[in-house]
């Protein structure tokens, strides 16, 4: 992946650029997780790309490289409760702002994947498909995806009946069936890890 986007800003005098992206907007449960990353300018990381286009093994390998070689990196989340209160778009923005706020040094410019950048305390530029165009955003997307997948594997150990390690919380038929079975077995209780605003398609009999 080339550095054309970042290089354009470097050429105009910007010295510190971060990328940020989120993972987990679509699942029924768990947090939405954001990554933020400042990479050394021009660094080449093998196979760096949009995290969704990489195998799990390659994401894990890149996660290690990124965390070892980044100038600064961070991950943050918004909880299911925050998602239900704010909506998923606003919660995703909140998670990204939290992640960027944890970076040291603070960036002069943040490249934000997507078409929305709300309330960032520094200059922020949106980039649709940025995780496939900007190394800074691609690195952030990998940090977010790996962190969220690990969180769902941990939740799987807590709720083995839901098989979260397999579907990572996404709305599959198997997930809906497992959730219905869990609710039936627990007196109508929905686990607190769920985003209640996402359960409109949960058909109870």
Where do the PLM segments sit?
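RNase H-like, Mg2+-dependent phosphodiesterase core
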Residues: 1-205
């Amino acid at each position: 992946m080339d550095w054309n986007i970042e290089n354009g800003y470097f050429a105009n005098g910007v010295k510190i650029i971060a990328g940020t992206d989120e993972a987990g907007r679509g699942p029924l449960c768990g947090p939405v997780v954001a990554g933020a990353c400042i990479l050394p300018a021009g660094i080449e990381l093998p196979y760096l790309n949009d995290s969704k286009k990489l195998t799990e093994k390659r994401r894990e390998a890149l996660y290690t490289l990124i965390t070892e070689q980044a100038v600064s990196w961070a991950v943050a989340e918004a909880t299911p409760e925050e998602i239900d209160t704010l909506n998923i778009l606003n919660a995703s923005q909140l998670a990204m702002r939290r992640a960027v706020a944890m970076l040291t040094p603070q960036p002069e410019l943040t490249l934000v994947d997507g078409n929305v950048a709300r309330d960032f305390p520094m200059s922020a530029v949106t980039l649709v498909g940025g995780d496939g165009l900007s190394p800074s955003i691609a690195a952030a997307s990998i940090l977010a995806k790996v962190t969220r997948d690990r969180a769902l594997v941990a939740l799987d150990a807590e709720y083995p009946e839901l098989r979260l390690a397999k579907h990572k919380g996404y709305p599959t038929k198997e997930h809906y069936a497992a959730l219905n079975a869990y609710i039936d077995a627990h007196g109508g209780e929905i686990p607190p890890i769920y985003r209640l605003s996402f359960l409109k398609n949960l058909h109870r009999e």
